[in-house]
Amino acid sequence: MPKMKTKKSASKRFTARPNGSFKRGQAFKRHILTKKTTKNKRQLRGTQDVHETNLKSVRAMMPYA
């Protein structure tokens, strides 16, 4: 049986953690930032955990993570 392929788009967006969860970047921080408040932009910094409802699909896209 051949190896399973990793979805490259998923590997660029998600990072696996040792406990089995994944972290992801925040959306809504690319452009049209002038109408967003400073507080809103500050809260969009950093990373978030992938929600448990999406974990199954992320694990399927990254079988070796």
Curated annotation (Swiss-Prot):
One MF annotation (Gene Ontology) recorded for this entry: structural constituent of ribosome
One cellular component term from this protein's GO annotations in UniProt: cytosolic large ribosomal subunit
Residue ranges of the region described as Disordered: 1-65
Pfam families hit by this protein: Ribosomal_L35p
The keyword Ribonucleoprotein is annotated on this UniProt entry: yes
Entry keywords, A to Z: Ribonucleoprotein, Ribosomal protein
PROSITE patterns named in the record: RIBOSOMAL_L35 (PS00936)
Protein origin, superkingdom: Bacteria
PANTHER family membership: 54S RIBOSOMAL PROTEIN BL35M, LARGE RIBOSOMAL SUBUNIT PROTEIN BL35M
Family: Belongs to the bacterial ribosomal protein bL35 family.
Protein name as annotated: Large ribosomal subunit protein bL35
